Amino acid sequence: MGYISWLGKPDTEDSVLTLLLRQAGAVFYVKTSVPQTLMVCETVNNMIGRTVNPRNKNWSCGGSSGGEGAMVGIRGGIIGVGTDVSSFPFHVSN
């Protein structure tokens, strides 16, 4: 969620998605960044600052799941799982 008060306080249990991926053999090796409260159009938080587009440092990587998008953009993993709050781009593309 990007809250600085949660820094260094990991959850004691895995989420359902994490559990399913782990059972399927996934290896978690990195964390990606999110904007504070997730509902912002740009990925900026007080822990690591601004996450930029990996192909053009002058552009944003987007908000909500921007860190995940940046990771997928540099082929840093074989799967990216992001959140979806308003589906605005989805509605426009239909």
Where do the model's predicted regions map?
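Gly/Ser-rich catalytic/binding loops embedded in alpha/beta enzyme cores
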Residues: M1-S86
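Structural signature of FAD isoalloxazine-binding scaffolds in flavoprotein oxidoreductases
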Residues: S87, H91-N94
